[in-house]
C-alpha cells in the first residue's frame, strides 16, 4: 500500500515517520525548503516511546507523480485549499483521503472534491512541535 503524507511537520512527521519505521511504503509531499532540511538532517522524532532519525521518501509538488492508495492530510485547516491542489495528482480513482487536521469543517470540502465514500474520518491526539 502506497501512502502519501502531505506535510512532515509535528503531526504528519510523527505519524508518517512511525508508519515508515514500521515498514509501510510512505512518501512525504513537502515544500522544497522542508525537503532540503530533511535530506540534510533526516526526519527526527523525539518521543518517550523512542527516538528515531529517518531518511524518508520525499516529493515536492513539482516532482509528484502517480496515484497513491491513501493520501493523509496533516496540514492546518487554513491551508486546505492549497493542500487539495497539491495532492490532486496523487489521487486516483481508488485513492482514500484521510485528514488528520484540526477541526471538522474540512470534511464537507473534501467530500465535494473527492467523493464522500473516499474521504475517511481521521482523529489523532498528539502533542507535537516542529523543532530544529
Give the residues covered by each predicted segment.
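NAD(P)+-binding Rossmann beta1-loop-alpha1 motif at the extreme N-terminus of oxidoreductases
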Residues: 1-43
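Short, electropositive, low-hydrophobicity segments enriched in small/polar residues
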Residues: 11-21, 46, 54, 107, ...
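Conserved N-terminal Rossmann-fold NAD(P) cofactor-binding segment
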Residues: 25-68
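Rossmann-like NAD(P)(H) cofactor-binding subdomain of soluble oxidoreductases
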Residues: 52-132
Amino acid at each position: 500500500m502506497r501512502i502519501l503524507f502531505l506535510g512532515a511537520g509535528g503531526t504528519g512527521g510523527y505519524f508518517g515517520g512511525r508508519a515508515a519505521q514500521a515498514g509501510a511504503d510512505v512518501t512525504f509531499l513537502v515544500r522544497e525548503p522542508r525537503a532540503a532540511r530533511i535530506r540534510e538532517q533526516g526526519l527526527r522524532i523525539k518521543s518517550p516511546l523512542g527516538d528515531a532519525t529517518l531518511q524518508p521518501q520525499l516529493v515536492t509538488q513539482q516532482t509528484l507523480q502517480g496515484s497513491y492508495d491513501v493520501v493523509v492530510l496533516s496540514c492546518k485547516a487554513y491551508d486546505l485549499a492549497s493542500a487539495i491542489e497539491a495532492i490532486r495528482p496523487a489521487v486516483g480513482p481508488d485513492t482514500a483521503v484521510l485528514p488528520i487536521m484540526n477541526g471538522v469543517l474540512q470534511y464537507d470540502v473534501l467530500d465535494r472534491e473527492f467523493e464522500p465514500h473516499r474521504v475517511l474520518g481521521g482523529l489523532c491526539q498528539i502533542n507535537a512541535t516542529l523543532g530544529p
